Every structure is written in C-alpha cells, then in structure tokens.
Amino acid sequence: MTARRILVTSALPYANGQIHIGHLVEYIQTDIWVRFQRMMGNEVYYVGADDTHGTPVMLRAEKEGITPKALIDRVWTEHKRDFDSFLVSFDNYYSTDAEENRELCEKIYLALKAEDLIAEREVEQFYDPVKNMFLPDRFIKGECPKCGAKDQYGDSCEVCGTTYVPTDLKNPYSVVSGATPVRKSSAHYFFKLSDPRCESFLREWVADLAQPEAANKMQEWLGAEGEASTLSDWDISRDAPYFGFEIPGAPGKYFYVWLDAPIGYYASFKNLAQQRGIDFDAWVGPHSTAEQYHFIGKDILYFHTLFWPAMLRFSGYRTPTNVFAHGFLTVDGAKMSKSRGTFITAQSYIDTGMNPEWLRYYFAAKLNASMEDLDLNLDDFIARVNSDLIGKYVNIASRAAGFLVKRFDGKVDEAALAHPLLEQLREAAPQVAHLYESREYSKALRLVMELTDAVNAFVDTEKPWELAKDDGKRAALHAACSVSLEAFRLLTIYLKPVVPNVAAGVERFLNVAPLDWRAIDQQLSAASPVQPYQHLMTRVDAKQVDALLAANRESLQATAAPAAADAAAAIEPIADTITIDDFAKIDLRVAKIVECQKVEGSNKLLQLTLDLGEGRTRNVFSGIQSAYTPEQLVGKLTVVVANLAPRKMKFGVSEGMVLAASAADEKTAPGLYILEPHSGAVPGMRIG
C-alpha cells in the first residue's frame, strides 16, 4: 500500500498566557492521531507555532516594560516546554512572527488583490485619545444600542444578542485607558468573502466536511442556496500602533492577527521543509496530492471553514482536506475555575509530579469525533487510570515477566504463541486502526480494554504463580508466561499512540525494535530474551490531585500582583457610585434552570426556563451560549434580575436577566461565568 502524505496542525496558542489543561485536550487529541499515522508508515508532518501578533501582546509587553519580541520569545520557550512535557510530538514548533510568515502573508494578500478580492473602504472607528490608538471591538465597552444593557462589547450584546458596529454603542469607553473614545475615519482593507466566487466555492467545499456539526454550522453561515448570500466581507487590516506585519503598499496598516495566524501553519511547515529538504510547493500547491488536516476548538470554526479555505483557494494554494473541531473542557462538570484550583496549568501538573500519560490516557478515553464538550472528573480520573492502565494493562507484564526471566532466561516458548487468544487480539487490529483513524479514541480504548480483560482472564485461568510451585508443570508455566507477554506486546501496540513513553519502556523490557502497526504480524522471539521487568507506571495517588488543586489555588494568589498590572486590559473600571435606594430598586432572586435550549438562528443565545418560586416558570434569553451547553445548565441554581421589564426580542419575550461575569479582555481572561448560589439556597430567595 502506498504511504499517505499528511500535513497536520493544531490551533496556534496565543503568546499571551500559559498553557493549561483545556489547551492540552486539542494537542493530545492531535498528537495521538499523528502518532498513529506514523505507526501506519505514513509520511506525516505535525507543525505548530505560537500566535504572536495583535493588540493584547503589544499592551502586555508595554505593561511589563519589555518589547513585544522579548515577550513572545519568553512565552514561546514556556509553551514549547509544556508541549514537550506532555509528549506532543511536533515536527516543528515555530512562531508567526517569522520571515517565512511575513513572505507568505504578503504573497497571499497580493494574489487575492490580483483576483479583485481585496477592497479598500473608509471605516469610522473609535480612537483612544489617551493611548493614541484605534480600539479593536473587544477593547471598547458601552451600553447596547438596542436593549440598553451596560458594559457590552463593541461587536455584540450578550444580553439581547444584537450585533452592531462599535460606533453604535451608547456611552462608550476604552477598556485600555477608561477614556471616552472619539470617532475617526480610517482606510481599511477587506477580503471580499461575499464575492459569488467565494460563496460558490464554499458551498462545494463544505460537502466534504467530516463532522456533521461543522457542516450544519457552515450551512447556517452560508444561508440557503439560491437566496442572497449571508456572508460578510472580512476586515483584514488594523491601524498602527499594532504588533504585526505591515501591509505592502499601505504604510501604517497591518494585517489583522486572524489573517496571519492560519498562514502561520504554512510558515511553520515551510521552515521545516527548508530544514529537511521537503518540496514545500508539492505539499501546499493547488495540485497537491498530500492531505491537510486542521485540529481546532469549535470556537474558531468560523475562521477555519470560511476565511481560511477561501483565502487559500483564490491565492493559488491547496485547500484543507478536512477540519476537525473538538469541544471545551470542563472539570468536575463545571468551567475551569481559579478559585477552585481547577484552572490547571500544564507546568503545575508536571511540577506536582503527575505523570503526563495519565492525562493523555484519560483524555483519550473521553474523546470522540464530535464537537461535544469533555469533562475531566477528578475522581473518575484517579479510578480509571489506576484500574485500566495499572490494574489491567501493566499488571499483565508484572504477573508473567518475573517467571519467564528467572525460570527460562527470558526466552519465550515460540511454539506456544499459536494460541487462539493471540489470534483474537490480532483480529481486532483493523477495527482499532479504524477507530484511531476516525478519531473515536474512546471507542478504541474501550475495545483495547475489553481485549485486556480477556488476557487477564487467561492469566487468572492459567495461574502461573501456582504452576511455578510444581516442577512437573514447567512447560505449562513457560507457555502461559510466553502467551501473556506476547499478548502484552500486542496490547502495547494498540496503546502506543496514547502512552508513548510506556510503550518505549515496554520495547526495552521485551527487547524488541520500536513497535509499529506492522509489528502486529510479528511475535516475540527466543533469540531476543525478555529483560528483567522494570516498573512501567505508578498509580495515581489522590493526594497528588489534592496537591495539584492546591497549587493552582495558590497560583491565583501568587499572581495577584501581575494580574493587577493587567487590570486595565482585563477588568473594566468600577461604575459610578449609586445610593442604597438605587440598589434597592433591583430585585435579585435565586432561580433554578428547569429547561435550557439553544436558540435557532443565534450562535450567542440560550433560551432558559426558570423557576423563581412563583408557582410559574419564566422565559429568559441569555447570551452565554459560548460558555455553556444546555446540558451543563439544567438543574443549576443561578441569580436573576427578577423585576426587569419584559423585553420583546426577535426570538420571543425575555422576562428577566441572568447575571454572568466576564473580563473586559477575553484574550487575557477568557470566558463567561454565571453566578451560582451556595448549596442550601432555594428558588425565589431574594439577594441583598
């Protein structure tokens, strides 16, 4: 069979913060798939980079009193360390602030311009007179022009779901300085995504997307065929001061970070190609026969399934073979929380002495090919790792290896290896391979654990520890241990993409060459004696998990001073003082979320049915879809403004407002967080 040629990427982490376990879901998912492809003998390259440009990086560097270059170099070192610690096997880990990326950005931009897909338009924007800079959407807040909700971002209202341009905001203020912005006009450059050529191409391209959820979401964005296009042109420029690449022929104008970030995939691969003598153009040119896959979070699907493929198609490059999106990580059923210690950084996990392969295995045991969210239940984490990896898998080797080494000089009984159990394990190879290929890791590991149970049942039946007591059963002992260790070798092949360090230890102990998928048709040989058994993995101790949570709770206090320095970017100014009489007008009540569902036609709103202890339920729309799934909210208690006048919206009448917290700068502190009363509160209780 001809080897496939595959280019694989994960999304680029932003160079403005630490890697945490939520990030690691994606990199572990990608790495498992890449390692499997390598084991299959395919030519696969896995590339990544830090996403380094944009206003948040520029402002953070300014606050730290260093250059943006110094900041991104430091963060790159930290990110690379974390990926190495979790065995993420990039062939090249690079930076978007690289000459290869500058050249590719300019080349793609000029090609799109030659295709008449770049338009120049005057745009009126808010300008911070204190910082002397134009303000991106997320660096402006004010009152929603439709419902009047305060402290809404410059692009959409999280209360009523309305979208708008920043200049529509009432009483706007700069998140950077707190100043009232002024309006200024500026020439901006747009990628004409609304061009009929782009729409026609995207309708054709979406048909090949593997994930139904992604295809359905794209159909929503594209609208019904035959109707007027719902696609909007994309502003790809930003004004100075800005940390990024200047647009050729446009002094003082810079490529928007979301243009140069995905091009960074190609820049990283080009840098690798130069190192290894790979024909870059043969891999990424329009007639390439290679495959190209992007693993991403579902929150950036829009950029990877609309802008990115259209940019490539009309600038003379091949388009992605597919885009694989995953869901978000929760911990113990809730969003990661610094106060609870569940906002766990990659470095703290390693510093606590936790084994990275424990987390790799647990994530794999929960991951599938869908975009559904994944929950790290810490009690289940301890139980599953200790049961599956230690109690079932590693236990096989520890029960058989000692007898084989001591009694038979480590030499297997080759004649015994024609056992039906081993044939059963080999017959599962195509199914395990199919499940890895299709990213159904949880099903793959479930099947492998079923096979592991069968091997343990064989060991329990043969009882080598009993056979060893009877010299007359020496041959039976030899056969039982030989079959057990050959079965262990086969199971290791199936688990190697997930636990590569354990697999390397097994290869040393079994005295075999590095295991790939072809090794399934081979077997242990008496000519290569098994070596003395060495412990492959220790059990998870609950005290380690407790220490990990404590370390991350402490990190919140330890970083309080740096966080204060970032306050201008992350936390908006305190509102004007009010009297106690003003506050008394607001009736805050505890409410139970009885039902919850997504609002058709909106990617921001959830429709909640709330019980406020009134003998009836209320209908409330809330712009929290980016942070919660309906399943996560049903049954929870929350806090509602109960005496807010009902508001008629596009999707129905909203009879209140659910309270939620967020930072001003979601790059620095991403997320929305609903308020949850402590246990004991009941629907209808007043808060005051």
Curated annotation (Swiss-Prot):
UniProt cofactor note: Binds 1 zinc ion per subunit.
Cofactor(s) needed for function: Zn(2+)
Binding locations of Zn(2+): C144, C147, C157, C160
PROSITE patterns assigned: AA_TRNA_LIGASE_I, TRBD
Catalyzed reactions: tRNA(Met) + L-methionine + ATP = L-methionyl-tRNA(Met) + AMP + diphosphate
Residues the record lists as binding ATP: K338
Keyword Repeat belongs to the record: no
Residue ranges occupied by any tRNA-binding domain in the UniProt entry: 582-688
GO terms classed as biological process: methionyl-tRNA aminoacylation
InterPro entries, per the entry: aa-tRNA-synth_I_CS (IPR001412), Anticodon_Met (IPR041872), Met-tRNA-synth_bsu_C (IPR004495), Met-tRNA_ligase_1 (IPR023458), Met-tRNA_synth (IPR014758), Methionyl/Leucyl_tRNA_Synth (IPR015413), MetRS_core (IPR033911), MetRS_Zn (IPR029038)
Places the protein is found: Cytoplasm
EC code(s) of this entry: 6.1.1.10
Pfam families to which the protein is assigned, alphabetical: Anticodon_3 (PF19303), tRNA-synt_1g (PF09334), tRNA_bind (PF01588)
Motif ('HIGH' region): 13-23
Gene Ontology molecular function terms on file: ATP binding; metal ion binding; methionine-tRNA ligase activity; tRNA binding
GO CC annotation terms, alphabetical: cytosol
Function: Is required not only for elongation of protein synthesis but also for the initiation of all mRNA translation through initiator tRNA(fMet) aminoacylation.
Assembly description: Homodimer.
Assigned protein family: Belongs to the class-I aminoacyl-tRNA synthetase family. MetG type 1 subfamily.
Protein name per its UniProtKB record: Methionine--tRNA ligase
The species this protein was found in: Cupriavidus taiwanensis (strain DSM 17343 / BCRC 17206 / CCUG 44338 / CIP 107171 / LMG 19424 / R1)
Species classification: Bacteria, Pseudomonadati, Pseudomonadota, Betaproteobacteria, Burkholderiales
Gene of this entry: metG
